[in-house]
Amino acid sequence: HATSTHLTPHVNAFDHYDVIMCAGPHQVQEIRRTEELKGLPPKELVEYGYDLMDKEIAAYSAMEHPPKGRPVVLIAPSWQEDNMLDLCIDEMLEQVIGRGYRIIVRPHPEYIKRYGARWEALQQRFASVPSDELYFESDFSSSDSIFAADVMVTDWSSISCEFSFTTLKPT
């Protein structure tokens, strides 16, 4: 992921490695500062980029972006404890359904894997809403919903980086 090295990993997660692959200069800066603060020996830091994001940026840039009939809201939460799907998704959806949006709920693939029954129950609770207004995405083989969205709502998933840096739209 392209996220920070100190936002989500364990506090000492990178301390004892000799070589670390870095998705960007922000990770290099964070690791160097951590080495300095903790008195750790310098590591070999390899800046390799973030292939997924590089490919998404290229694909999105090559696409045409015709005007849409209505704004698309992509709800794309993480899967860890206290994620939006478990805490507040019903209330969120109730606030936006019927207000002229196309809503896509795209959970992290791990959510469906671990919490399939919850995912199915959520879809059942909103089964009466037409799929052209509320769509529950479970095919993660493309980035189409990321590219189509006008805005993304997420918790602390790194998909926010993919969306905002690829489309230059708000998360």
Task: List the model feature ranges, each with a label.
Residues 27, 111, 158-159:
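Alpha-helix capping/helix-boundary segments
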Residues 12, 139-171:
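A donor-sugar binding/catalytic signature common to diverse glycosyltransferases
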Residues 1-57:
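Active-site and donor-binding regions of nucleotide-sugar-utilizing enzymes
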Residues 18, 71, 147-150:
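Conserved acidic residues
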Residues 1-5, 92-95, 167-171:
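A short, gly/pro- and small-residue-rich
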Residues 13, 66, 95, 145-146:
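Structural alpha-helical scaffold elements that stabilize or flank donor/cofactor-binding regions
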Residues 46, 51-123:
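Conserved catalytic-core segment of nucleotide-activated headgroup transferases in glycan assembly
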Residues 119-138:
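Nucleotide-activated donor-binding/catalytic signature segment of Leloir-type glycosyltransferases, i.e.
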